């Protein structure tokens, strides 16, 4: 489960500075959602290989009107759903009444809170932070967010349990990969040169084959997510089911269809069918982001009557950035006349042409039309994302791509692609080795991605292709001269000296 870190504190203590430092590898992901203040920020950050969501809660000032009145509803929700809370104070300004009011609220939440004294650069930090121990929140961690001092050590401490879980999972996956495929690079290159690649048993079932497919139904409020969830589950089912460990997260609902097990991750709060008429869905950005991270496949629900909005694109961008498979679901399709339907399809083609690999379904969640076909696309996307393909097959496809369209010339030399192998799954990641790959134009990279996608019949999931320069075996080595070459060199040097 992707951890969530909430940044809490009164204005101007450095929350935005820390937020920008943590999310430097990615832009802020979500903004302008209904019910959120304009300065609310949600972003994705990384600590090593651990991805986590960071939330700048903002809007907390703890004035005499009371912390409960001045804290926005979404800020309360962010703190409630966070795994870790970083309570930031200003070491230069000292302890204020606002800090005390916020601390009092945080103590009531029983959350794991780290008290962070920011702006300790250029001052005696130990003396400056001493008064903050009176907040009774334990150790006070010194930081200079503007310069990055103290940030890494604090994150490693705060996210230690999640890092341990990640290391354990990575160790198991590495061991499994080593068992499944261990190729000799030199032997492979000889086979490539001799045209002896064996592409039999080119694909194999993954260790995910027996696991249920987790899919998340995501989208803006009031596009019909709850209606679709209930329709997919069936009318007569008691549908509220919290699996262990999900009390603060979305509802996880196990189900089975045609002997295939699924888990629906519902972000809207699932209701009995009799209550589907309620117009306002409980909506949490954090729940949506965490559901996307945890899912294998995401069903992005779009309102046909409103077509594509910037909010839809924001959610879609997060899905693609996290590498999740996606199925586009255009809901409320019934009742539209033919002219409007054509306009909607044209708008989808115009604004979503960059994800032509995703299946698009036009449905009515309320009446059930088209809903049954969603399961076919979910399975297709999941199998495409998790199928394992041999090095021999990937290398052969790469060769065919070169035969159909040669790489360009760079500085008078043609870019050379040597071999390809799998670098990961969910999403599929292909690593290509060769020479001068750093000079390969983006247009040819896109060509290769599309060629692999078409050859492997990959639908519903992004494909990532990485390029690695092959090592030069002579780099850093001096050329050893033979005895006759050494004598000739000495004669030339002596003749040059006489001149």
UniProtKB/Swiss-Prot annotation:
Coiled-coil regions listed in the entry: none
InterPro entries referenced in this protein's UniProt entry, alphabetically: G_ENGA (IPR031166), GTP-bd (IPR006073), GTPase_Der (IPR016484), KH_dom-like (IPR032859), KH_dom-like_a/b (IPR015946), P-loop_NTPase (IPR027417), Small_GTP-bd (IPR005225)
This protein's encoding gene: der
Gene3D superfamilies per record: 3.30.300.20, P-loop containing nucleotide triphosphate hydrolases (3.40.50.300)
Record organism: Aeromonas hydrophila subsp. hydrophila (strain ATCC 7966 / DSM 30187 / BCRC 13018 / CCUG 14551 / JCM 1027 / KCTC 2358 / NCIMB 9240 / NCTC 8049)
HAMAP family: GTPase_Der (MF_00195)
Complex formation: Associates with the 50S ribosomal subunit.
The protein's name in its UniProt record: GTPase Der
Domain of life: Bacteria
Keywords, alphabetical: GTP-binding, Nucleotide-binding, Repeat, Ribosome biogenesis
Residue ranges occupied by any KH-like domain in the UniProt entry: 387-471
């Amino acid at each position: 489960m992707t951890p969530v870190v909430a940044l809490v504190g009164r204005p101007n203590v450095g929350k935005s500075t820390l937020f920008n430092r943590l999310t430097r590898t990615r832009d802020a992901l979500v903004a302008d959602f209904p019910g959120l203040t304009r300065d609310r920020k949600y972003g994705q950050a990384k600590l090593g290989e651990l991805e986590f969501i960071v939330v700048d809660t903002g809007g907390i000032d703890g004035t005499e009107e009371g912390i409960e009145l001045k804290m926005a509803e979404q800020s309360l929700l962010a703190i409630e759903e966070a795994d870790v809370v970083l309570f930031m104070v200003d070491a230069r300004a000292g302890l204020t009444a606002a800090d005390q009011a916020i601390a009092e609220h945080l103590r009531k939440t029983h959350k794991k809170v780290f008290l962070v004294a920011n702006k300790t650069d250029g001052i005696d930090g130990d003396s400056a932070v001493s008064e903050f121990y009176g907040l009774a929140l334990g150790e006070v961690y010194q930081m200079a967010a503007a310069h990055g001092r103290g940030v890494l050590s604090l994150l490693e401490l705060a996210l230690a349990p999640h890092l341990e879980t990640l290391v354990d999972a990575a160790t198991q996956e590495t061991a499994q990969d080593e068992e499944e495929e261990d190729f000799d690079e030199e032997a492979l290159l000889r086979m490539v040169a001799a045209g002896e690649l064996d592409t039999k048993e080119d694909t194999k079932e993954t260790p995910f084959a027996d696991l249920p497919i987790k899919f998340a139904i995501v989208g803006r409020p009031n596009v019909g997510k709850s209606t679709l969830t209930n329709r997919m589950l069936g009318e007569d089912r008691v549908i509220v089911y919290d699996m262990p460990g999900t009390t603060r997260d979305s509802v996880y609902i196990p189900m089975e269809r045609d002997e295939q097990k699924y888990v629906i991750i519902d972000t809207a709060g699932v209701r009995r069918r009799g209550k589907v008429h309620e117009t306002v869905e409980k909506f949490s950005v954090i729940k949506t982001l965490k559901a996307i991270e945890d899912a294998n496949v995401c069903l992005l629900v779009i309102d046909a009557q409103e077509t594509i909005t910037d909010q839809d694109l924001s959610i879609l961008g997060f899905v693609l950035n996290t590498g999740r498979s996606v199925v586009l679901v255009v809901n409320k399709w019934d009742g539209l006349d033919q002219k409007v339907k054509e306009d909607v399809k044209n708008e989808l083609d115009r604004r979503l042409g960059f994800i032509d690999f995703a299946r698009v379904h036009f449905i009515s969640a309320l009446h059930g039309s088209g809903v049954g076909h969603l399961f076919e696309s979910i399975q297709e996307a999941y199998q495409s994302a998790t199928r394992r393909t041999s090095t021999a097959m990937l290398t052969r496809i790469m060769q065919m791509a070169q035969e159909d369209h040669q790489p360009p010339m760079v500085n008078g030399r043609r870019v050379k692609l040597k071999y390809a192998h799998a670098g990961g799954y969910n999403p599929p990641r292909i690593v290509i080795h060769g020479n001068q790959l750093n000079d390969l134009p983006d247009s040819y990279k896109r060509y290769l991605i599309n060629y692999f996608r078409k050859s492997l019949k990959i639908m519903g999931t992004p494909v990532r292709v990485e390029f690695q320069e092959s090592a030069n075996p002579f780099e850093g080595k001096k050329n050893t001269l033979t005895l006759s070459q050494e004598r000739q060199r000495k004669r030339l040097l002596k003749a040059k000296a006489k001149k």
